[in-house]
Amino acid sequence: MSNDGRSRNRDRRYDEVPSDLPYQDTTIRTHPTLHDSERAVSADPLPPPPLPLQPPFGPDFYSSDTEEPAIAPDLKPVRRFVPDSWKNFFRGKKKDPEWDKPVSDIRYISDGVECSPPASPARPNHRSPLNSCKDPYGGSEGTFSSRKEADAVFPRDPYGSLDRHTQTVRTYSEKVEEYNLRYSYMKSWAGLLRILGVVELLLGAGVFACVTAYIHKDSEWYNLFGYSQPYGMGGVGGLGSMYGGYYYTGPKTPFVLVVAGLAWITTIIILVLGMSMYYRTILLDSNWWPLTEFGINVALFILYMAAAIVYVNDTNRGGLCYYPLFNTPVNAVFCRVEGGQIAAMIFLFVTMIVYLISALVCLKLWRHEAARRHREYMEQQEINEPSLSSKRKMCEMATSGDRQRDSEVNFKELRTAKMKPELLSGHIPPGHIPKPIVMPDYVAKYPVIQTDDERERYKAVFQDQFSEYKELSAEVQAVLRKFDELDAVMSRLPHHSESRQEHERISRIHEEFKKKKNDPTFLEKKERCDYLKNKLSHIKQRIQEYDKVMNWDVQGYS
């Protein structure tokens, strides 16, 4: 009986849908097309499903007792001498490592990863992730008929792939621009200091290596003479001091090594600090840091100069090598200068010069940053406190001959006002709220012209508001000229009068004149005049840009 049931199941086609199919989702039951039809929407025979990589096994797969269940393959743990993590570390990352694994390494049971919820039928455009553990169409796991049912009711979006984010390869120009933006800091004086710091580290390492290579000579000296003057050379030392020499008590190599190590550690700290964002944003805006860095470089210059003098003095043993009484065949090994010692002396003096150059660059950086801060301060003052003369220039417009130019739409040269954002430098105090940058409405309302129709529309707007601007400009200009005349008259009035009544009368005149200047109607007209001037300048600039592009196109085709 079980064999007949299996044979009938084999004869059934894969595109047939039984009428008594249990549904897991209640939303699909409401569609009667799935209950009335025995087949799916597509009547074309479908290819058989792909076979699994390995046949299933186990006692639950076979319902008959006559047939022997398949023997489970002998699964043994794979023991490798070199772990895979080490291989992947030396091999590098791959884009899709699962494709390169052999069949025996494929895991048919997923890890303990949390499964994503199934896709909702009410949202046909939603795509479940690839690692979902359930069928996204509401059927059982891996059933082919449930996919056909969902495709029939909710067809897939053919344009679903358009919203995928594609990662394009950057061009050479984009890479060069990013490189210049990232490393343009190295072109400044602060960047030169960082380069000199790297040179100082290399030279300091050379000093340390060369001096350490011949430290055994110091041990031989102390083993032979101890920590005092050489035996029998006290008189020689006294004679040398009599003729301007000095005493020599032993090598001072530890002092040279301490100076080289201290300078190396200080230099690497300054170098790491200089490559940070804190150095660029905070320290460079301060007045004390460039001078502090100058002092550090001067101190290291003095230390290296002292170390170089001490090391040169050690090579000739404090001048004892110049005396025949000391320079005997027994002591000749102490007076012989090796090639590594000569290299150490060269490195010491070159490093000393590099630290001196770094100190001079720090002074140049201090002056450069002071000039930059002063320039930013002056620009901020010009933005915050515009002069009265600049305001008057914005409303100046000649009224003679304007009617004739209106008909020909001849635009007058109108310079646009420069709108610069407020610059904040230095440490931002807590609770500081920056002032918003107010952008005029006509900037977004009148973008770049693309067609001739837009040019005609811009031209009509210009003609319509140019007459209003002329009237306001003439009126405001007349009032400003009247104010200039009254200013001249008011300046001639006496500031201190002998009579009290005269003083009160002059005070009332000043107050009345101040009220006239601050009249809301006049200020509103003046503000409207400034707005129209900037707006017309913007529209005129857009039209000129479009005409220039069109002229280029005509010349190119001709």
Curated annotation (Swiss-Prot):
Q: Is-annotated flag, keyword Flavoprotein?
A: no
Task: State the InterPro entries in the record.
Answer: ELL/occludin, Marvel, Occludin_ELL
An individual GO BP term: cell-cell junction organization
Which parts of the chain does the record assign to the membrane side Cytoplasmic? 1-194, 245-254, 313-319, 363-558
Q: Membrane-crossing residues?
A: 195-215, 224-244, 255-275, 292-312, 320-337, 342-362
User: Basic and acidic residues composition bias: which ranges?
Assistant: 1-16
Q: How is it modified after translation?
A: Ubiquitinated by ITCH; but this ubiquitination does not lead to proteasomal degradation. Polyubiquitinated at Lys-412 via 'Lys-63'-linked ubiquitin chains; deubiquitinated by USP53. Phosphorylated.
Q: Which residues carry this modification: Phosphothreonine?
A: 166
The protein's superkingdom reads Eukaryota
**Matching Pfam families:** MARVEL, Occludin_ELL
Where is each MARVEL domain found? Answer: 188-367
Give compartment(s): Cell membrane; Cell junction, Tight junction
What's its membrane topology? Multi-pass membrane protein
Q: Where is this region: Disordered?
A: 1-58, 115-145
The disease tied to this protein in UniProt is: Deafness, autosomal recessive, 49: A form of non-syndromic sensorineural hearing loss. Sensorineural deafness results from damage to the neural receptors of the inner ear, the nerve pathways to the brain, or the area of the brain that receives sound information.
Name of the protein in question: MARVEL domain-containing protein 2
